[in-house]
From Swiss-Prot:
Assembly and binders: Alpha(8)-beta(8). The alpha component is a flavoprotein, the beta component is a hemoprotein.
One MF term in the entry's GO annotations: FMN binding
Natural source organism: Shewanella sp. (strain MR-7)
Record's protein name: Sulfite reductase [NADPH] flavoprotein alpha-component
Record gene name: cysJ
Enzyme class, first EC level, given as a word: oxidoreductase
Length: 604
């Protein structure tokens, strides 16, 4: 078989391994290829490797539990790793892998498959899961009558397509003849309890199907290697860092408050790569908590139980409970507690609930929808009603090659006004209000799907309006440290040039030094007709298409709801106009770029 024809479907290699092999061999001459061929043949025929290549018996295969995860953040991976550890402790052989590293040709050999998968954007599969998701939906997918499976779906009920990817996997596996060990488990953002219960239930369901032995060795289990590379500080055990700077970087006349935040990681040993995110735990605003307590007529010092702790109600609302983000279940529960005709009517319409959630907080429910006389909502019932506080993720705006033990963020203060009452985002207000020396609990959330090219000579195109420019500041710091000679192109947009040009002097310095090849900006409200980044992209379509033909990697960061979609449509239009592609071929072209890691998005 010619190497150019090689694919993961025609070999025992995964698609990422195929791409690495193609990249390596493309750089070798005939003599070098011959030497590598001999080396690989000798390695493969070594006694130890021959033993590893021996076929697995049916009995051995039947005793292996394959656990696959697909998640845009680390939540799915964490759940899968914890399940793998519990399964190994019970004597099961475990194959733990990311869906992105899994060879789909192996699927028809599986007998026990446990999936943990999140949903990204509007019902889309996360990057890790795309290839497996597509394979199962294709005509190439095999019948799976020998397979038992279970799916844990992660999602956010405030979005329309809640847990859609998990639903897709469950439906497709069933259609292919696989047998469900358990009904599909759908988890909201407060997934910990449901995931823990699934661990227990699925291992109980697996037990009658396989034999265990105390001496079983886990096969292809990468969880130990993963754990070794991770810091001791995690989402569950964050590092108490110090805020060094929280500086407004929009002008006095701007209607947006955007902060440049610098945080000292000190002696934590926390490391990050450009493209990663920082998880930030925060406390709710005390004024907001006092307003809620007064509105409900509850005493701040009333003792409540949260988990295994007995704390005051006020402390629970400050530190443990989500107050600034509503979710459908809470709106529906409050409709029943208040018996409000408006809320009751609204709660039956998913789209109306979604719109309501976007513009209201829990304090608005308390203020505007009074509880009915027999609601009987005491302090403990209140904390049970509210879901746990969750950290917020911010794209990191710095490279450790330049800032060492610091980490920088670009934070837009989320603020709104409802019936004359100011409302702020929980984490953004916490960071915007933080004074020098304040403590903030943080952890690094890796994002391997938003990485610079391995070769610093590769051109990059960066599209980041608003705070979406944050990771590209990190990209530029890293490329300067690398001495990268590849061209770089930034598209940036915001309302006004004078008020909202984030990091303007830094971009100008990069241009002057030749580190940034070009920048195109769109300031939407500086002229009568609004101009956005997608318009600039279309204007530069011929040049941008040429960059892509020359191997450029394309990155988008920022708003998923509108910007990323509009930019994608602009890119498709360029492929049609300047590449001569049909609409279908243009979609396929960018899908190919994505699968080759040349089209990456960090959208939210």
């Amino acid at each position: 078989m010619l190497l150019k024809e090689l694919s993961s479907l025609a070999s025992p290699l995964s698609q990422p391994q195929v791409e690495k092999l193609k990249q390596l061999t493309a750089e070798l001459n005939a003599v070098q290829l011959a030497w590598v061929s001999g080396y690989l043949a000798a390695t493969a025929n070594a006694p130890g490797n021959l033993a590893q290549l021996a076929p697995v018996s049916d009995a051995q295969a039947a005793q292996t539990v394959t656990i696959l995860y697909g998640s845009q953040t680390g939540n799915g991976r964490g759940i899968a790793k914890a399940l793998a550890e519990k399964a190994k402790a019970q004597g099961y052989s475990v194959n733990l892998a990311s869906m992105g590293e899994y060879n789909v040709r192996q699927l028809k050999q599986e007998t026990l498959l446990l999936l943990v998968v999140s949903t990204h954007g509007e019902g889309e599969a996360p990057d890790d899961a795309i290839e497996l998701h597509k394979f199962l939906a294709s005509k190439r997918a095999p019948q799976l009558s020998n397979l038992h499976y279970s799916v844990l779906a992660l999602g956010d009920s405030s979005y329309e397509f809640f847990c859609q990817t998990g639903k897709d996997f469950d439906a497709r596996l069933s259609a292919l003849g696989a047998k469900a060990l358990l009904p599909l488990v759908e988890c909201d953002v407060d997934y910990e309890a449901a995931a823990g219960q699934w661990h227990a239930d699925v291992l109980t369901a697996v037990k009658p199907l396989i034999q265990t032995t105390a001496n079983v060795v886990a096969l292809n289990d990468t969880s130990s290697a993963l754990a070794a590379s991770e810091s001791e500080f995690t989402k569950q055990n964050p590092y108490s860092a110090e805020v060094l700077v929280s500086q407004k970087i929009t002008g006095r006349g701007s209607d947006r408050d955007v902060r440049h935040v610098e945080i000292d990681l000190g002696e934590s040993g926390l490391c990050y790569e450009v493209g990663d995110a920082l998880g930030v735990w925060f406390s709710n605003n005390e004024t907001l908590v006092d307003e809620i307590l007064a509105g409900l007529g509850l005493a701040a010092d009333t003792k409540v139980t949260v988990g295994n702790e007995s704390i005051s109600l006020k402390q629970a609302l400050l530190e443990k409970k989500e107050l600034t983000q509503l979710y459908p279940g809470l709106v529906k529960a409050w409709a029943e507690l208040s018996a409000s005709p408006e809320l009751l009517a609204l709660s039956g319409d998913k789209e109306q609930v979604r719109q309501f959630i976007l513009h209201h907080q829990f304090a608005d429910l308390v203020a505007n929808y009074q509880l009915k006389a027999d609601a009987n909502l005491d302090a403990n019932k209140l904390v049970e009603l509210l879901r746990p506080l969750t950290p917020r993720l911010y794209s990191i705006a710095s490279s450790q090659s330049e800032v060492d033990t610091e980490v920088h963020l670009t934070v837009a203060l989320v603020e709104d006004e409802h019936q004359g009452q100011a409302r702020f985002g929980g984490a953004s207000h916490f960071l915007a209000s933080a004074e020098e020396g304040a403590e903030v609990k943080v952890y690094v959330e890796p994002n391997k799907h938003f990485r610079l090219p391995e070769d610093p000579q590769t051109p990059v195109i960066m599209i980041g309006p608003g705070t979406g420019v944050a990771p590209f500041r990190a990209f530029m710091q890293e490329r300067v440290a690398q001495g990268a000679e590849g061209d770089s192109w930034l598209f940036f947009g915001n309302p006004h040039f004078e008020q909202d040009f984030l990091y303007q002097t830094e971009w100008q310095q990069y241009l002057k030094n030749g580190d940034l090849t070009r920048i195109d900006v769109a300031f939407s409200r500086d002229q009568a007709h609004k101009i956005y980044v997608q318009h600039r992209i279309k204007e530069q379509g011929q040049t941008l298409w040429q960059w892509l033909q020359n191997g450029a990697h394309l990155y988008i960061c920022g708003d998923a709801e509108r910007m990323a979609k509009d930019v994608h449509q602009a890119l498709l239009a360029i492929a049609v106009e300047f590449g001569g592609l049909s609409s279908e071929a243009a979609e396929e072209y960018f899908e190919t770029l994505r699968s080759h890691k040349r089209y990456q998005k960090d959208v939210y």
